Amino acid sequence: MTNIRKTHPLIKIVNSSFIDLPTPSNISAWWNFGSLLGLCLIIQIVTGLFLAMHYTSDTMTAFSSVTHICRDVNYGWLIRYMHANGASMFFICLFLHVGRGLYYGSYTYFETWNIGVILLFAVMATAFMGYVLPWGQMSFWGATVITNLLSAIPYIGTTLVEWIWGGFSVDKATLTRFFAFHFILPFIIAALAMVHLLFLHETGSNNPSGLISDSDKIPFHPYFSIKDILGFLILIMLFMTLVLFTPDLLGDLDNYTPANPLNTPPHIKPEWYFLFAYAILRSIPNKLGGVLALVFSILILMLFPILHMAKQRSMMFRPLSQCIFWILVADLFTLTWIGGQPVEYPFIIMGQMASILYFTIILIIFPSISLLENKLLKW
C-alpha cells in the first residue's frame, strides 16, 4: 500500500514541500533563515491576534488600551513585547536572508527573488502601520512625516496624502484604516510566502558553491528539519532573552508619551530597521528626489539579476566580489547609524557619501568587478 502522505491531495503538498523535498546536501546555516522567517510570521500573527482582542483603534483610547493590555490583561505585557520585538527579529532574519541571496547568487531565480522583494515591501508597510497603532509621540509624528512624503508626487500628491489620511491631518480615520491594513497584510504576506516557496520548489534550492547539485540531493526530512528546529531554538532563546530582559532596547522611549499634535519631538526617526532607508531619504535636499531614492534603495534589489555579469553564480570563489560585498554591508551599518543621528554636520555629509557609495557599489562596482574576475579567470 502506498503511503498516505504521497497520495492524499492535501498531505502530498506538505510532503513534497517539507518531507521528501530533494535538498542540496551542502547548504549551510545561512539557508535556515527562510524557515526562521516563517516562525517569525507565525509569532507575529498569533501575538497580534491576541493584542487585537484588547486594542481599540480610536485616537482617544488607543494609547490607554495599550497601557491596559500591559497592566491588566493576563500576560498582556509579554504578548505586547513579543509582538514589538518580534518585528525586530523578523527584520534581522529578513536582512540576513536577503544578504545570503546576494552573496550566493540566489537572485538568478527571477520569480522567487522578485516575489521576495515584494514580500520585503509588504513587511515594511506592515511594520510601519503597526508602529502607528500605539498612538505615542513617535507613532503620530512618524505617520505624519512618512505619509507626507507622498505629497512630493507631482500634481496628485496633496490629494493623495489627504485621501490616505482621511482628512486634513493624521487623525482617527488614519488610525482606523492603518489598524485594518495592519491586520490584513500579514495574511497577504503568508499567501505571498507560499507563492515564494512554490517558485523556489520549481527550481530547487541554490547552494553555497552555486553549482548544479542535482547529483547530490538528500531528503529535507529528517536532515534539514532537525537543522531548522535547532535554528528555531536559537532564535527563540535570543528572542525571549531580548523580550524578558531588555524589551525597550530597540524601541523609542518617546512612544511612551501619548501623541500630541501640538508638540513635535526633537528627533523624529523610525524604528531601527528603517534607518538605512531614512538616511538615504534625508541625504537628498530635494523632497521628490529623496522619496525616489528611498523607494529605489529597496527596488534596486530587483536589478541584481540583470546586473549579474559574473560567469560564476556564487561569490564563494570570487574574493574581489566578496570584498565589495562586505564593504556594502559596512555601508548599510553606517547608513543605519546615521539615520538615527540629528540632521547636522558631520552627519549630513557622511550620510550623502554613504548613500552615493550604496548606489555606486550596486550599479557600477559589482558588475565591473565581476567582469574583471571573468577576465582574470580567462573566461
UniProtKB/Swiss-Prot annotation:
Mention one GO molecular function: ubiquinol-cytochrome-c reductase activity
Q: How does it sit in the membrane?
A: Multi-pass membrane protein
The entry describes its oligomerization and partners as: The cytochrome bc1 complex contains 11 subunits: 3 respiratory subunits (MT-CYB, CYC1 and UQCRFS1), 2 core proteins (UQCRC1 and UQCRC2) and 6 low-molecular weight proteins (UQCRH/QCR6, UQCRB/QCR7, UQCRQ/QCR8, UQCR10/QCR9, UQCR11/QCR10 and a cleavage product of UQCRFS1). This cytochrome bc1 complex then forms a dimer.
Keyword set includes Transport: yes
CDD domains on file: cytochrome_b_C, Cytochrome_b_N
User: Protein name, please?
Assistant: Cytochrome b
Q: What does this protein do?
A: Component of the ubiquinol-cytochrome c reductase complex (complex III or cytochrome b-c1 complex) that is part of the mitochondrial respiratory chain. The b-c1 complex mediates electron transfer from ubiquinol to cytochrome c. Contributes to the generation of a proton gradient across the mitochondrial membrane that is then used for ATP synthesis.
What changing residue 253 to P does, per the record, is: In strain: Isolate SP802 and Isolate SP805
Name the coenzymes or cofactors required. Answer: heme b
Q: What else is known?
A: Heme 1 (or BL or b562) is low-potential and absorbs at about 562 nm, and heme 2 (or BH or b566) is high-potential and absorbs at about 566 nm.
List residues binding a ubiquinone. Answer: 201
Q: Which residues bind heme b b566?
A: 97, 196
Gene name, Swiss-Prot/TrEMBL? MT-CYB
Q: Which UniProt keywords apply?
A: Electron transport, Heme, Iron, Membrane, Metal-binding, Mitochondrion, Mitochondrion inner membrane, Respiratory chain, Transmembrane, Transmembrane helix, Transport, Ubiquinone
Q: Which residues cross the membrane?
A: 33-53, 77-98, 113-133, 178-198, 226-246, 288-308, 320-340, 347-367
Which positions in this protein are listed as binding heme b b562? 83, 182
Coiled-coil stretches noted in the UniProt entry, renumbered to this chain? none
Q: Cofactor comment in the record?
A: Binds 2 heme b groups non-covalently.
